[in-house]
């Protein structure tokens, strides 16, 4: 307590299905967030043997690494249901104020967690690294994934897209 007021720590959670995602793509964002005063947490599946080598490097960056049982496929229901439960526990345990979701399943679970935590004023950011319903995609992708993204957009505070086609599609969503 300083001068009679509490200083709140700011916690942000980065979520992706693959452990190497943060190491390969988010290091500069992590540094930027830390300079802004955020304590950075990273939730991912750390048990995939291919990605184990990055754990020490991520922790040396000052990032709190958390294993969740997230699967790369949205159709692995049991693992993803367990991952959602683990994600909600992290949000509550560390008083997470913002969650930045990456990868399709990370985006799905992160935004669903945001919906379940609306009473906490959790800010939900989703970076779509290319929607799966692009022109020329299989009919299943264009019909099912478009509808899923449209629904999940309601639980998204900030949507970041990386190309013009995705930007135009995102314009049809209600954030």
Feature locations, PLM:
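Short His-centered aromatic/hydrophobic patch
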Residues: 101-106
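Nucleotide-sugar donor phosphate/pyrophosphate-binding loop at the beta->alpha transition
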Residues: 78-85, 122-125, 133-155
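A short beta-strand/loop micro-motif in the catalytic core of glycosyltransferases
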Residues: 99-100, 155-163
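N-terminal strand-loop element at the rim of the active site
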Residues: 9-79, 165-174
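Glycine-rich phosphate-binding loop signature in dinucleotide/nucleotide-binding domains
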Residues: 90-97, 119
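Active-site proximal beta-strand in glycosyltransferases
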Residues: 11-13, 115-132, 149, 160
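Structural motif
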Residues: 11, 97-98
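Short, Lys/Arg-enriched N-terminal segments with co-localized hydrophobic residues
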Residues: 1-7
């Amino acid at each position: 307590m300083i001068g009679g007021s509490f200083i709140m720590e700011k916690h942000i959670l980065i979520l992706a299905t693959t452990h190497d995602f943060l190491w390969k793509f988010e290091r500069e964002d992590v540094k930027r967030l830390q300079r802004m005063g955020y304590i950075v947490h990273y939730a991912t599946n750390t048990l995939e043997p291919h990605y184990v080598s990055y754990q020490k490097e991520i922790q040396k960056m000052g990032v709190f690494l958390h294993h969740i049982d997230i699967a790369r496929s949205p159709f692995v229901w049991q693992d993803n249901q367990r991952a959602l439960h683990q994600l909600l526990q992290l949000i509550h345990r560390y008083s997470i104020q913002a969650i930045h979701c990456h990868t399709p399943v990370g985006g799905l679970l992160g935004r669903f967690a945001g919906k379940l935590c609306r009473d906490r004023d959790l800010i939900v950011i989703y970076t779509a690294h290319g929607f799966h319903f692009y022109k020329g995609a299989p009919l299943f992708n264009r019909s099912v994934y478009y509808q899923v993204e449209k629904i999940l957009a309601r639980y998204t505070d900030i949507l970041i897209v990386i190309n013009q086609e995705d930007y135009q599609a995102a314009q049809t969503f209600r954030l």
